[in-house]
Amino acid sequence: MANSKFEYVKQFEQPDSLLPNTWIVVRLDGRGFTKFSTKYAFEKPNDKRALDLMNAAARSVMSELPDITIAYGVSDEYSFVFHKSCTLFERRASKLVSTIVSTFTAYYIHHWPTYFVDGPPLSPPLPSFDGRAVCYPSVQNLRDYMSWRQVDCHINNLYNTTFWALINQGGMDGTAAELMLKGTFSADKNEILFKKFGINYNNEPEMFKKGSVVFRNYELVEPGTKKVSEEEAEEMSSSAVPEVKSKSQVEKDKKVRTKAKIVVEHLDIIRDEFWERRPWLLSGTPGKVPKEP
């Protein structure tokens, strides 16, 4: 910016760099998606096209931003995780959130015709998302956050599956279905599904029950193999002085990440096994790219 008498306005800008040496999670949510899903006749309780579209947009975001370690999505929300050592945009919250949200929204609209082939084209108001950034100081905090989202997915999906079965197959209206489910537990909902409608909840698609996890796929580590453990990752990433990699190492890691395939899986991310078999998610160091068959 050229020097001028107007340059003083820069003094009003507020620094918004996020805490150093903490995991950054940028979570986005659809704005007004209840009306949006009605407008485009999303299937209830789950529309596979809509979920596949969300996953495609998330993959595209991760492809454009190698700094993202892992992402998790369910319904109209997605969480993107940056490693503690991330220095992208000098860790400025406004830059990170706006980049994630705008890139995701752009790809959501871009991929729409691929997944909603027979439906009407998008028209205003167009789909949009809001976002926020939260810092988590430890690996356990991060894992608890991810577990919270997946548990929330299960609870909501079981309720919605039962609720819409009562409406679509049981002939109830929304008020009656809601009243019937009031105060019920998971076992009660499973019993309603099975006894009334012959639905075994365990046979529902994994994506509906567990959500979607997106990450770069490297060679899996066998349980018990000596790699970077969670405790070691915790110790390395929680030191008072954040690790600073050389420029050459940063470039090397970036090249490895671009070679890795970005996958969408529907796995249990609460259990230790998921993380133990993919130590690169916590260590911040890329794994070994699988050989092509």
From Swiss-Prot:
Record PANTHER family: TRNA(HIS) GUANYLYLTRANSFERASE-RELATED
Protein family according to the UniProt entry: Belongs to the tRNA(His) guanylyltransferase family.
Sites where the protein binds GTP: 29-34, 75-76
Keyword terms, alphabetized: GTP-binding, Magnesium, Metal-binding, Nucleotide-binding, Nucleotidyltransferase, Transferase, tRNA processing
Coiled-coil segments: none
A Pfam entry, by short name: Thg1
EC number(s) reported in the record: 2.7.7.79
Protein name: tRNA(His) guanylyltransferase
GO-annotated biological processes: tRNA modification; tRNA processing
Protein function: Adds a GMP to the 5'-end of tRNA(His) after transcription and RNase P cleavage.
Reactions mediated catalytically: a 5'-end ribonucleotide-tRNA(His) + GTP + ATP + H2O = a 5'-end phospho-guanosine-ribonucleotide-tRNA(His) + AMP + 2 diphosphate + H(+)
Sites where the protein binds Mg(2+) 1: 29-30, 76
Keyword flag Disulfide bond: no
Binding of Mg(2+) 2, residues: 29, 76
GO molecular function: GTP binding; identical protein binding; magnesium ion binding; tRNA guanylyltransferase activity
Region (Disordered): 226-252
Co-factor requirement: Mg(2+)
Cofactor comment: Binds 2 magnesium ions per subunit.
